[in-house]
Amino acid sequence: MAENSGRAGKSSGSGAGKGAVSAEQVIAGFNRLRQEQRGLASKAAELEMELNEHSLVIDTLKEVDETRKCYRMVGGVLVERTVKEVLPALENNKEQIQKIIETLTQQLQAKGKELNEFREKHNIRLMGEDEKPAAKENSEGAGAKASSAGVLVS
């Protein structure tokens, strides 16, 4: 019987834990958001480089005779085409890449807002961040100390 009451106590404790988020859960959520933001930024930077490459190739091919042979990598296979065939496809790809970059930029801005709201909601301070506002809150008294207990993330 003592074992059953011990188990009931543990399960009710874990139920209470679901209502209040622990510091580890807050840090994990914050790090997840930061990682998602980094992923979006990385993908946007990669597409920017690809866009620059497309622009360079398009500019070069515009100066060349349309009947000249050129080679294009399609699905890992090098295909022989003419400039006349390749140029419209490259320009179309460039436009699509620009649209994707715009979408990623909007997603990146939205993720930044979400990250800032999460920081404010959970009172998250990054290491090395200015700690003067926290010092002012702590000097106000014990009540302020309890409410300003935030999470420090490295």
From Swiss-Prot:
<dbReference type="GO" id="GO:1990062">
    <property type="term" value="C:RPAP3/R2TP/prefoldin-like complex"/>
</dbReference>
<keyword id="KW-0963">Cytoplasm</keyword>
<dbReference type="GO" id="GO:0044183">
    <property type="term" value="F:protein folding chaperone"/>
</dbReference>
<dbReference type="GO" id="GO:0005634">
    <property type="term" value="C:nucleus"/>
</dbReference>
<dbReference type="GO" id="GO:0005654">
    <property type="term" value="C:nucleoplasm"/>
</dbReference>
<dbReference type="GO" id="GO:0006457">
    <property type="term" value="P:protein folding"/>
</dbReference>
<dbReference type="GO" id="GO:0005737">
    <property type="term" value="C:cytoplasm"/>
</dbReference>
<dbReference type="Pfam" id="PF01920">
    <property type="entry name" value="Prefoldin_2"/>
</dbReference>
<dbReference type="InterPro" id="IPR027235">
    <property type="entry name" value="PFD2"/>
</dbReference>
<dbReference type="GO" id="GO:0101031">
    <property type="term" value="C:protein folding chaperone complex"/>
</dbReference>
<keyword id="KW-0496">Mitochondrion</keyword>
<dbReference type="InterPro" id="IPR002777">
    <property type="entry name" value="PFD_beta-like"/>
</dbReference>
<protein>
    <recommendedName>
        <fullName>Prefoldin subunit 2</fullName>
    </recommendedName>
</protein>
<dbReference type="GO" id="GO:0005739">
    <property type="term" value="C:mitochondrion"/>
</dbReference>
<dbReference type="GO" id="GO:0061077">
    <property type="term" value="P:chaperone-mediated protein folding"/>
</dbReference>
<keyword id="KW-0143">Chaperone</keyword>
<comment type="subunit">
    <text>Heterohexamer of two PFD-alpha type and four PFD-beta type subunits. Component of the PAQosome complex which is responsible for the biogenesis of several protein complexes and which consists of R2TP complex members RUVBL1, RUVBL2, RPAP3 and PIH1D1, URI complex members PFDN2, PFDN6, PDRG1, UXT and URI1 as well as ASDURF, POLR2E and DNAAF10/WDR92. Interacts with URI1; the interaction is phosphorylation-dependent and occurs in a growth-dependent manner.</text>
</comment>
<comment type="function">
    <text>Binds specifically to cytosolic chaperonin (c-CPN) and transfers target proteins to it. Binds to nascent polypeptide chain and promotes folding in an environment in which there are many competing pathways for nonnative proteins.</text>
</comment>
<dbReference type="GO" id="GO:0005829">
    <property type="term" value="C:cytosol"/>
</dbReference>
<feature type="region of interest" description="Disordered">
    <location>
        <begin position="124"/>
        <end position="154"/>
    </location>
</feature>
<dbReference type="GO" id="GO:0051082">
    <property type="term" value="F:unfolded protein binding"/>
</dbReference>
<dbReference type="GO" id="GO:1905907">
    <property type="term" value="P:negative regulation of amyloid fibril formation"/>
</dbReference>
<comment type="similarity">
    <text>Belongs to the prefoldin subunit beta family.</text>
</comment>
<feature type="compositionally biased region" description="Low complexity">
    <location>
        <begin position="140"/>
        <end position="154"/>
    </location>
</feature>
<dbReference type="InterPro" id="IPR009053">
    <property type="entry name" value="Prefoldin"/>
</dbReference>
<dbReference type="GO" id="GO:0001540">
    <property type="term" value="F:amyloid-beta binding"/>
</dbReference>
<keyword id="KW-0539">Nucleus</keyword>
<dbReference type="GO" id="GO:0051495">
    <property type="term" value="P:positive regulation of cytoskeleton organization"/>
</dbReference>
<dbReference type="GO" id="GO:0050821">
    <property type="term" value="P:protein stabilization"/>
</dbReference>
<dbReference type="GO" id="GO:0016272">
    <property type="term" value="C:prefoldin complex"/>
</dbReference>
<feature type="compositionally biased region" description="Basic and acidic residues">
    <location>
        <begin position="124"/>
        <end position="139"/>
    </location>
</feature>
